Amino acid sequence: MELTAGVTTELSGAEITLRCLQEEGVEIMFGYPGGAVLPLYDEIFKQEKVKHILVRHEQAAVHAADAYARSTEKVGVVLVTSGPGVTNAVTGIATAYMDSIPVVIISGQVPTHAIGQDAFQEVDAVGVTRPCVKHNFLVKDVKDLAVTMKKAFYLAATGRPGPVLVDIPKDVQTAKTNFFYPQSVSMRSYNPVVKGHSGQIRKALQLLLEAKRPMVYTGGGVVLGNAAAELLQLVHTLGFPCTNTLMGLGGYPATDPQFVGMLGMHGTYEANMAMQTCDVLLAIGARFDDRVIGNPKHFFQEERKIIHVDIDPSSISKRVRVDVPIVGDVREVLQEMSRQLAAGKERPDPVALKTWWDQIGAWRGRDCLKYDRNSKIIKPQSVVEKLYELTKDMDMYVTSDVGQHQMWAAQFYKFNKPRRWINSGGLGTMGVGLPYALGVQLAHPHATVACVTGEASIQMCIQELSTAKQYRLPVKI
């Protein structure tokens, strides 16, 4: 590891932790106190740069930090105590992990001399969270604390983002050492590829230009990779149909005529038919989830060439065989695609494209999302449509719980911007909606935040209404 110059001062481990957060530009953290983190809480109250939000349950702390990260491009931060504090947080951590959200979780731990002795409120935080974090650390020496915190933020935010846990024993929090915060870290075992291979990009473009029935399939990676503008430019240049997954909504504007709707088991007929019958498929920041393609064996009954762009090499050819893999940051790859396309004169066959769009138009004609608009009973679909009409010109964010209401929100609210739709797609965690709304509202105090929820989901984290009241957060439910 290489370190660059920082600042040197003798501080306690708790002071170092707070200084690290300040160095990373953290403004808000979510947490719940306990015995193993009291030194940290003592330091929180001595400073004003990092605001602490007291939730009513550790699960909600992680959900709120998760939503804060989703809506801001920043890393969410959580502070929990040892034992039940960590175990309560696991559902939130797993939710963030499945959706690739950058969150740093700081957990207290029993003193180092008591680890492994079944001490009061002792839990193996590293072992418990190993399956649902991008990485985790147990800090046994205060001298390692600052660089570990730097690593945690670096790992959480780069490559394929994800939650990182830092477990800090109580005696490490009280021990003192010189504070040196590195401005950067370099780890030989971790080196995410950013730029896609130019040869693979050329090969992909050739396939796309020769396609008769092309399709662009995008997921949450476009949103997380801040590649919405680059995607729109490429799709408009090519003239291809584009679809988003549940996690990708907003990555391509829903009101654009080339958008064929959401994909998957709750998606539109035209999006699914185009996906199943295309001859060249460009997948960007998506992972061919079972809710999108179903059984991979059935998906391959039709012949097609697949191009897959993703920052995570382990996602490529994981569920389906890929013809042209491109590992890299989706924004960088899309920019290079547009550059190469602009440099050449070749364009897709307009006659073949018209025939393809005519077929898609016929599928659209089925109006698969229609419902009885004359019913005397208020339909949920109508409620979501009305919400969109009332708020489409506002600075608006929509959070959702998990269930049928989530799908109605995804189907009938037209998301034209990224990071405006906050929901649990991978783990499908009921109860996220309200704490998500709190996290978004704190991140965007002047925006309007609405939580679409169901009668069961709202009860799973309903105690967070108290948090909303305490901090005067005007979320709409």
Region annotations inferred by a language model:
Residues 14-18, 22-27, 40-44, 358-435, ...:
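Active-site diphosphate/adenylate-binding microenvironment
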Residues 120-159, 277-278, 324-325, 333, ...:
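Conserved thiamine diphosphate
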Residues 1-8, 143, 206, 303, ...:
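Phosphate/pyrophosphate-binding active-site segments
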Residues 70, 220-307, 416-447, 459-463:
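Glycine-rich, anion-gripping cofactor-binding loops and their flanking helix/strand elements
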